[in-house]
């Protein structure tokens, strides 16, 4: 740890152009500050999944190019074997009704690094929605119920897995086509 305030000034100055370049990319996605509200994480996720981010703190988090709306939930799994995605600090029946009309993207991170992202259809979350509704019979709201990461991994369709390139990227770098793959040709 530095003992003098300016000991690492040259280091941060040399790194800063990369941060500014990252912010320039984030500007294209409507992210005003990569250091606020998980801006850098949302930028990485938007690029990895091809979703457009919806600005604001209320309503859907993202939409795809054909207009489907998405809830996006993230969790930092650094140092954890299991965990859960937080949802809403004031979960009500109205919130659940809204959730039933959206697709979902769940993403796990190792600190700032996107590790995996899964697409989950609302109907696949129905067991969780029903449990929440059952719990709401005796309460006016639930305080941030979680959706287990392992459950999402079980029911979700992978959209992104770190270190596993998507099929289009493999073709782009190797020149191997789907016909080559089906006929047994390798790179």
What are these model-derived regions, one by one?
Residues 1-187:
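Nucleic-acid endonuclease domains
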């Amino acid at each position: 740890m530095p003992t003098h305030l300016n000991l690492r000034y040259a280091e941060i100055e040399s790194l800063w152009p990369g941060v500014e370049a990252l912010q320039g990319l984030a500007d294209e996605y409507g992210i005003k500050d990569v250091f606020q509200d998980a801006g850098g994480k949302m930028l990485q996720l938007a690029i990895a999944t091809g979703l457009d981010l919806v600005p604001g703190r209320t309503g859907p988090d993202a939409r795809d190019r054909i207009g489907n709306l998405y809830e996006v939930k993230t969790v930092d799994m650094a140092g954890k074997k299991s965990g859960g995605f937080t949802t809403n600090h004031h979960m009500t029946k109205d919130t659940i009704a809204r959730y039933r009309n959206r697709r979902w993207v769940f993403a796990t991170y190792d600190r700032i690094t996107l590790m995996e992202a899964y697409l989950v259809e609302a109907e696949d979350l129905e067991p969780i929605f029903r449990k929440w509704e059952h719990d709401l019979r005796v309460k006016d709201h639930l305080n941030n119920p979680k959706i287990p990461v392992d459950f999402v991994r079980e029911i979700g369709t992978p959209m992104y897995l770190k270190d596993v390139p998507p099929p289009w990227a493999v073709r782009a770098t190797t020149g191997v086509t789907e016909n080559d793959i089906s006929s047994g040709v390798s790179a």
